[in-house]
């Protein structure tokens, strides 16, 4: 609210995933749904310009989407979003585990590990000319 009052645009973020502690661990699905919807309405009242959330059950996402007064950006929530989104790192395959709704278009984790190993080996063999590479002649 303080940021909004200071004229700074704010996008709210919540959801059912582990990154969202305010929903509460150990609660029933119904309690989580009520908490989620309450948090979304509170963010709207505080003046957010949009809400982002992840992994919300379809029926809850639908209810929130129908009640929302701001744009909704969501991942893993079905069609009930103004703009579906996907985590960039999952899209590029930087994560070993992917959420069931996420599709990887490459395996950059493996490629990054291999590139790093090659770099380390070149350093160990003394093949990197540090002074030249950083512009010190």
Residue spans of the language-model regions?
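Alpha/beta enzyme core
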Residues: 1-137
């Amino acid at each position: 609210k303080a940021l909004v009052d200071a004229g700074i645009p704010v996008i709210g973020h919540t959801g059912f995933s582990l990154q969202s502690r305010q929903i509460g661990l150990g609660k029933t699905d119904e309690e989580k749904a009520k908490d989620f919807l309450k948090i979304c309405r509170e963010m709207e009242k505080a003046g957010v310009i949009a809400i982002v959330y992840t992994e919300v059950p379809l029926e809850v996402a639908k209810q929130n989407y129908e009640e929302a007064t701001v744009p909704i950006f969501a991942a893993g929530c079905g069609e009930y979003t103004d703009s579906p989104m996907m985590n960039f790192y999952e899209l590029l395959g930087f994560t070993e585990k992917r959420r069931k709704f996420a599709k990887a278009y490459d395996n950059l984790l493996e490629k990054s590990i291999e590139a790093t190993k090659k770099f380390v080996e070149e350093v160990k063999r003394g093949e990197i000319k540090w002074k030249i590479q950083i512009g010190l002649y």
